[in-house]
Amino acid sequence: MSQLTLTLLMIVAAYLAGSVSSAVLVCRMRGLPDPRSQGSGNPGATNVLRIGGASSAAMVLFFDMLKGALPTYLAYLMGIDAISLGLIAIAACLGHIYPIFFGFKGGKGVATAFGAMAPIGDDLAICLMASWVVLVLISRYSSLAAIITALLAPLYTWWLDDRFTIPVAMLSTLIIIRHKENIQRLLKGEESKVSRKKRPKAP
């Protein structure tokens, strides 16, 4: 099989893997409202945190990251070049953003993009996660944390393993474009802050 054929097959496989909406499936299994019609309307871990609590959000986060990590890492093991790895990672994110199995209404792709970047190295994964967590704790805006972390990701990659700077920059660009509406709401002071589902008070 030629390198081009293998790359195209992995792009299709990555898109299909990304199209499995973890948020919708976890909410269905746990009897929670559809995240596409509740909270922010975004089927991602942050919105599931709002409507279903931390454990449900953690499940969504894990599986969304896995959707990006598995196809990208498998392609890396197959010897696919760095630029093609970037295209495969983008395909996984596009599947998450526009899932064919869920009416093309998906999330922002942040966790899936992080999952695709994480196999580059533990040091990069730690830098990205630490940046996002610190920014969320400071600002309470998940979207702002994601945008700034996406901007930092190519710089971290260039510093730690410059072979993958271009693929990571491609992913970061996609994430920032996907947050266009969030950027507008942030500028207007209308963006929702991170909050957990409130437990009902005991009678």
UniProtKB/Swiss-Prot annotation:
The keyword Chloroplast is annotated on this UniProt entry: no
The reaction(s) this protein catalyses: an acyl phosphate + sn-glycerol 3-phosphate = a 1-acyl-sn-glycero-3-phosphate + phosphate
Keywords recorded for this protein, A-Z: Cell inner membrane, Cell membrane, Lipid biosynthesis, Lipid metabolism, Membrane, Phospholipid biosynthesis, Phospholipid metabolism, Transferase, Transmembrane, Transmembrane helix
Transmembrane region(s): 6-26, 82-102, 118-138, 141-161
Membrane topology value: Multi-pass membrane protein
GO biological process terms, semicolon-separated: phospholipid biosynthetic process
EC supergroup of this enzyme: transferase
Subcellular location as annotated: Cell inner membrane
Gene Ontology CC terms, in alphabetical order: plasma membrane
Pfam family, one: G3P_acyltransf
Origin: domain of life: Bacteria
This protein's pathway: Lipid metabolism; phospholipid metabolism
Disulfide bonds: none
GO molecular function: acyl-phosphate glycerol-3-phosphate acyltransferase activity
EC number(s) reported in the record: 2.3.1.275
Family, similarity comment: Belongs to the PlsY family.
Job of this protein: Catalyzes the transfer of an acyl group from acyl-phosphate (acyl-PO(4)) to glycerol-3-phosphate (G3P) to form lysophosphatidic acid (LPA). This enzyme utilizes acyl-phosphate as fatty acyl donor, but not acyl-CoA or acyl-ACP.
Quaternary structure and interacting proteins, as annotated: Probably interacts with PlsX.
Name of the molecule in the record: Glycerol-3-phosphate acyltransferase
Gene this chain is encoded by: plsY
